[in-house]
Amino acid sequence: MDILKKSLFLVLFLGLVSFSICEEEKRDTEEEENDDEIEEESEEKKREAPERPPGFTPFRIY
């Protein structure tokens, strides 16, 4: 009975450790994907709107 408890505890512990490692890797990949998306969006914004000097307006005011 004692051997059964120890082996069951060991199996559950190893399962918990492997599960937490998988969750950590999953979280890391999601963060990397989000960072890539943010970088792509900022690059698109730079391409769409060129930088203008402060106070510059494309409209002429007479």
UniProtKB/Swiss-Prot annotation:
Localization per record: Secreted
GO molecular function: toxin activity
Keywords for the protein's UniProt record, in alphabetical order: Amphibian defense peptide, Bradykinin receptor impairing toxin, G-protein coupled receptor impairing toxin, Hydroxylation, Secreted, Signal, Sulfation, Toxin
Transmembrane parts of this sequence: none
Entry-linked InterPro entries: Frog_antimicrobial_propeptide (IPR004275)
Residues with 4-hydroxyproline modification: P54
Distribution of this protein across tissues and organs: Expressed by the skin glands.
Gene Ontology biological-process entries: defense response
Residues annotated with Sulfotyrosine modification: Y62
Keyword Signal: yes
Pfam family, one: FSAP_sig_propep
Family: Belongs to the frog skin active peptide (FSAP) family. Bradykinin-related peptide subfamily.
Descriptive protein name: Kininogen-1
